[in-house]
C-alpha cells in the first residue's frame, strides 16, 4: 500500500506504534467489569457503587481536561531532536503502562480510598494517553502529503489498530481463565500486566525506529501562533459538526464494545472466555472489510461510505436486542454485521477526515494545527469514554437488587438498556455526519 515518498518499512513501523490501543481496549472492556462485575460472576465482588464509580471517572476527566489540546499545541511547535511528535510518545509510554496496571491493584482500606484511587489513576492514565496518542495520530498529515496518501496511511494504521484491539479483546478471556484457574481477579491482574507491556513496547519501537526527523525534514514551515489563537481556528462550522458527530459515534461504539463481556455472560449465558469468539467475529469482519472500504472511499466519497457503515452498525445492534439464551446463535451473524460497519466508521475515516481538515485549515491560514486538531479529537474521544462510563454504569444495573453498602450488579435488563443507548447515539451521529460537507 506504500506510495512514493513513504517506504513499506515506514508504513510498518508507523502501524506498530498504535499498539497503545491494547491498553485502550483493556480499559474499555475490563475496568468496569473488575469494579462492577455481573451478578453471575462468582469470584469478583463489586468494589464501588455505580454512583462512586461514575464520580471517579468524572473526577479523572477533570484532571485530564486541558491536556489534549495543550499537548497537541506543544507538539505542533516542538523542536525536539527526536521529532516533534515522537518526543511526546517517548515521554508518555511508561506512565501509560504504570497507570494501567495500577487500576487493577486498588486501595481497599475503605470505599472512599478505592474511590480516590480510581479517580486519581484515571486522571494520570489519560494524561499519559494524551502524550502518546495525540502526537502519534498527528504524524499522519506530517508524513502523508496528499489526500490519497493520508487515506492509505490511515488504512494501514487502522489495520494495525484493529489487530491490536482484537488481540486485547480476543485473548484476555482465555488468559484470565487459564492463569486465574478459577480466580478471576488473579487472572485479570496477570493478564493486564502481560498485555500492557506488549502495548507500550510497540510505542517505543515506533518512536525510536520511525526516524520522524528525517521523514519530515522537507515539511513546509508555518507561522507560529499562540495557543488561544490555535483554538479559535478550530471553531469553523465544518470542524464543529465533525467533532459532534465523532463524539456521538464513539460514545455509542465504546458502549457496544464495552458490554461484550456482559452480553456474553448475561444474555447469551456463556462463560466469560466465550467473548473470545464474539470479539473475533466483530473485529475479524472489520478487518476483512478494510481493503473494500479503502477502494470504495476512493471511488465514491468518505461521507457516502461512512453513512453506509453506520447504517449497517445500527441494524446489527438493533438485532442484538432480540437475542436470548434460546436463540443465541443469532448473535454471531449480528456481531459480524456490526464489524462490517465498524471498518470505516470506527477505524479508517476518523483519521482521514481529521487529517484532511487539519491540512485544509493549515494551508488556508498558513498555520500548523495538526497536533491540536488531533488533541481536540482526543479530548472528544475521552468525553466519549466518559459518556460510555456514565451510561453503562447507570444502565447496566437496572433491575438489580441492592446488596450491602449500596452495591449493585449488572442485569439482563441493564444490558439491553445499554444497547438501546448505543443505538440512539449511533443514530444521532448519522444525522451530524450527514450534515458535514465533503473535504475537497
Give the label of every model feature segment.
Residues 2-440:
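Membrane-embedded alpha-helical bundles of multi-pass transporters/translocases
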